[in-house]
Amino acid sequence: VARPVIFVLAGVNGAGKSTAGERELTQAGLTWFNPDTFTRQLIKTTGAPPAEANAAAWQAGVRQLDAAIAGRTDYAFETTLGGNTIAAKLREASKTHDVLMWFVGLGSPEHHLARIKLRVSRGGHDIPETKVRERFESSRRNLIALLPYLSQLQVYDNSVDATIGQPMP
């Protein structure tokens, strides 16, 4: 009997997680929880301030992950992997699930910050510089600590920028 799967699309803000993973996951028939998308929906439907909507989206994602672990069901989600909560839950999930991760990274915090600045110039959301710098280190520490618990890991260096509409380098 196949074990249920927890699929994790991880990486620091601005790494290109959504861009790199959305098409592949959708083509594979997976619906996944993207906290940024959920935050935008909450702001639009409830008028909640961005910080409040972001916190609610994060909590919703954690509840869904908890439900998938408890119910032994498949779940796919996106995370920065910057904090301790998700890493602990993935260790727990590995007891009953195959935990598969795609980790999308860039070579420096400065590159993440430049990508975020570009995203903001196009109407996207900003992330404080201190958070990006913290997550650059903590996400890698969490990734290394999770290695024994992952059934599969693919790491993507997304440092080469591509022009929209052009083939990926």
Regions found by a protein language model. Give the residues of each.
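Conserved glycine(s) of the Walker
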Residues: 16
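NTP-dependent small-molecule kinase module
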Residues: 145-169
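Glycine-rich phosphate-binding loop used to anchor ATP phosphates in small-molecule kinases
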Residues: 56-104, 139, 146, 154
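Conserved substrate/cofactor phosphate-moiety recognition/catalytic segment
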Residues: 19-73
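Short hydrophobic/aromatic beta-strand immediately N-terminal to the Walker A/P-loop
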Residues: 6-8
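A glycine- and Lys/Arg-enriched "phosphate-lid" helix/loop adjacent to the NTP-binding pocket
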Residues: 96-142
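P-loop (Walker A) phosphate-binding loop of NTP-binding proteins
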Residues: 12
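Phosphate-binding P-loop
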Residues: 1-4, 68-69
